[in-house]
């Protein structure tokens, strides 16, 4: 998979052009009636988005998402509350702008020449490419020349339709596709996984995140080059909202908060390993249930799923794991560390998890207070892996090379240098396997993303199954076996977890309400 590129030079040029266009209207309150005045009078910033791990999602009652966090900061910047409306597809998002039901669209939408004819783009803050995906084990197209409408389905309003039309006119005259007006990109990705669809197209970041939970999804080819991502608002003579957005993005770029949010959601890397991810998810099904109560019990200061991800990276959840250097157990503790924590048996699952959690808490407590709260864990994990002293060296090296020692984005880039003599020879604590610490933290982040998404998916499907049980009467085994897709066959699909709504497979008459 192509690596994600945040092309700040390109984004900067586009932002400058936007600034030039907006310059006459920078004084926000120069008019008696403008968008900013209306938003502040209302006291609410209305943002429409799409439910996805990157843009906006709700997990255990808490809201997450790159676009959500940026929108919340922008609302704070304006001194108003944030109201988020979730839509099913991109067409519905732009309907909200057209109908006056939204002030902004914040949903990972790409800048496109056709869109900017009718809508006002904001500053560009990262970039993606559009990719055609298929299911592992099925035919992989090597070119769009062989793709037709019986195979390729696109979500309504998807910007790639314009690119496909240009490609059809210039390179692939037989290229064809269909648009499903009722489904969003996430649903179409799920249908590719289930085998209901052959292909669809989505952006590279969304695909990368989706693969952490659904490793059967594979990239066949890139349909476009990198495209900048932006927010959209209404296009009219009043540019006060666009001017405010430009000022806001400039401020969070200067104070580093934009980089921190991007690191949180985009900084885990996108080197996808199908075999490793599939093995991990199998372990989640087969091994984690026995250990889950212990992770929940001892993960006091951190998310238990992160503690579980650390343990998987350390030992693949094998309580008897032993390395060539003598570290042992689920959390791979050294003998000295175990003794300092009062542990008597490193191969005892409960002792190992409790000891590892306490040791990580010690590392967290040592991280300088100048490090932002949401990045402290990554510094602590690097220290957990290579020692706290070497983490201090990494911060020192970051300063010497004109980086920010409190930014995980900057520090992690220097970690591999700790094993190179021109650098470690000038550091206080000398040589360290910094490249291993870098990979260690990145792998844990990937496992955590997979685990959170996978468990959320299972909870969603369990809720659907419960609703199904309430809506339909019991189905006898004889009736069930008459269906083309028996329940047991359905439940065995996709590595033991559901990939689409159970309601698709049932046709019995719904119970009448009494």
From Swiss-Prot:
Active-site residues from the entry: 314
GO cellular component: cell outer membrane
Region (Non-LT domain): 31-269
Enzyme class label: lyase
Region (LT domain): 270-514
InterPro entries in the cross-refs: Lysozyme-like_dom_sf, MltF, Solute-binding_3/MltF_N, Transglyc_AS, Transglycosylase_SLT_dom_1
Signal peptide as annotated in the record: 1-30
Record's keyword annotation contains Cell wall biogenesis/degradation: yes
GO BP terms, alphabetized: cell wall macromolecule catabolic process; cell wall organization; peptidoglycan catabolic process
Source taxon at top rank: Bacteria
Subcellular location, record wording: Cell outer membrane
EC number(s) recorded for this UniProt protein: 4.2.2.n1
Membrane topology, as annotated: Peripheral membrane protein
Keywords associated with the record: Cell outer membrane, Cell wall biogenesis/degradation, Lyase, Membrane, Signal
Catalytic activity, as annotated: Exolytic cleavage of the (1->4)-beta-glycosidic linkage between N-acetylmuramic acid (MurNAc) and N-acetylglucosamine (GlcNAc) residues in peptidoglycan, from either the reducing or the non-reducing ends of the peptidoglycan chains, with concomitant formation of a 1,6-anhydrobond in the MurNAc residue
UniProt GO molecular function: peptidoglycan lytic transglycosylase activity
One family name in Pfam for this protein: SBP_bac_3
Cell wall biogenesis/degradation keyword on record: yes
Similarity comment: In the N-terminal section; belongs to the bacterial solute-binding protein 3 family. In the C-terminal section; belongs to the transglycosylase Slt family.
PANTHER family in the cross-refs: MEMBRANE-BOUND LYTIC MUREIN TRANSGLYCOSYLASE F
Record remark on domains: The N-terminal domain does not have lytic activity and probably modulates enzymatic activity. The C-terminal domain is the catalytic active domain.
Function: Murein-degrading enzyme that degrades murein glycan strands and insoluble, high-molecular weight murein sacculi, with the concomitant formation of a 1,6-anhydromuramoyl product. Lytic transglycosylases (LTs) play an integral role in the metabolism of the peptidoglycan (PG) sacculus. Their lytic action creates space within the PG sacculus to allow for its expansion as well as for the insertion of various structures such as secretion systems and flagella.
Name of the protein in question: Membrane-bound lytic murein transglycosylase F
């Amino acid at each position: 998979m192509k690596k994600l590129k945040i092309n700040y030079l390109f984004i900067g040029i586009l932002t400058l052009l936007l600034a030039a266009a907006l310059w006459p209207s920078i004084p926000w309150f120069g008019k008696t009636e403008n968008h900013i005045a209306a938003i502040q009078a209302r006291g609410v910033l209305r943002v429409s988005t799409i439910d996805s791990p990157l843009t906006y999602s709700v997990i255990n009652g808490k809201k997450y998402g790159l676009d959500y966090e940026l929108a919340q900061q922008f609302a704070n910047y304006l001194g108003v509350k944030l109201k988020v409306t979730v839509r099913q597809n991109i067409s519905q998002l732009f309907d909200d702008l057209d109908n006056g039901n939204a002030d902004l669209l914040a949903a990972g939408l790409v800048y496109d020449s056709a869109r900017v004819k009718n809508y006002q783009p904001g500053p560009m803050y990262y970039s993606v490419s559009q990719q055609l995906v298929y299911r592992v084990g099925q035919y992989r197209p090597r070119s769009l020349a062989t793709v037709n409408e019986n195979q390729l389905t696109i979500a309504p309003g998807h910007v790639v339709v314009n690119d496909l039309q240009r490609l059809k006119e210039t390179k692939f005259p037989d290229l064809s596709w269909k648009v499903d007006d009722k489904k969003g990109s996430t649903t179409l990705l799920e249908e590719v996984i289930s085998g209901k669809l052959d292909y669809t197209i989505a952006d590279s970041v969304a695909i990368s995140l989706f693969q952490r939970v659904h490793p059967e999804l594979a990239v066949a080819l890139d349909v476009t080059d990198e495209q900048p991502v932006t927010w959209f608002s209404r296009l009219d003579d009043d540019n006060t909202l666009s001017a405010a957005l430009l000022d806001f993005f400039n401020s969070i770029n200067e104070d580093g908060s934009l980089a921190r949010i991007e690191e949180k959601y985009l900084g885990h890397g996108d080197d996808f390993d199908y075999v490793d991810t599939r093995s991990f998810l199998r372990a989640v099904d087969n091994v984690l249930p026995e250990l889950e109560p212990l992770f929940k019990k001892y993960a006091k200061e951190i998310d238990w799923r992160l503690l579980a991800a650390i343990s998987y990276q350390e030992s693949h959840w094998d309580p008897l794991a032993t390395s060539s250097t003598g570290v042992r157990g689920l959390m791979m503790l050294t003998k000295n560390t175990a003794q300092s924590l009062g542990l008597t048996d490193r191969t005892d699952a409960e002792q190992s998890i409790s000891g590892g959690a306490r040791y990580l808490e010690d590392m967290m407590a040592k991280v300088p207070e100048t490090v932002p709260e949401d990045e402290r864990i990554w510094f602590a994990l690097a220290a957990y892996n290579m020692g706290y002293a070497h983490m201090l060296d990494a911060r020192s090296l970051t300063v010497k090379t004109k980086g920010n020692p409190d930014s995980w984005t900057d520090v992690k880039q220097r970690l591999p240098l700790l094993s190179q003599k021109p650098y470690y020879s000038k550091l206080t604590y000398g040589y360290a396997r910094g490249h291993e610490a870098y990979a260690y933290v990145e792998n844990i982040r990937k496992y955590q993303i997979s685990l959170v998404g996978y468990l959320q998916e299972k909870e969603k499907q369990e809720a659907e199954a419960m609703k199904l049980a309430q809506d339909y009467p019991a189905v006898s085994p004889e009736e069930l076996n008459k269906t083309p897709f028996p329940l047991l066959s359905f439940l065995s699909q996709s590595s033991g977890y559901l990939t689409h709504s159970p309601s698709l497979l049932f046709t019995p008459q719904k119970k009448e309400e009494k």
